[in-house]
Amino acid sequence: MILKNFIVFEGIDGAGTSTQIEILKKRDDADRFFFTTEPTDSETGKFLRKMLKGDVELDPRTSAFLFAADRNEHLYGTGGTNCGVVAKAESGKIVVSDRYLFSSLTYQSVTCGDELPRRLNESF
């Protein structure tokens, strides 16, 4: 999917993606932007954050499915304050996301191979 007004900061842990987004938030014209993250703050995203902190243990394939579900909510849903990216971008907001598709493809490929993450995310 190609989405106008959608900018993603990707990078390994500690690469500075969040730092760059914080710099953007301090701009005078920051109201033109809609800032978001993956995992989202939807219920699925909150569960994924617990998993990432080690509070919940899941099979890697299960987590791959949940990340794809959270990405769908991120793009189209209304289940969190940072969801509904497509609607925000189409309304003229510049959407800036801290992580997106390539993070899933990279991290999940390590734990469950290339094929499943690629198939789950091919529509994104």
Residue ranges and their predicted role:
Residues F9:
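Hydrophobic anchor at the beta1->P-loop junction of P-loop NTPases
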Residues T17:
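Conserved lysine of the Walker
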Residues L24-R27, M51:
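Hydrophobic residues on the short alpha-helix immediately C-terminal to a glycine-rich phosphate/catalytic loop
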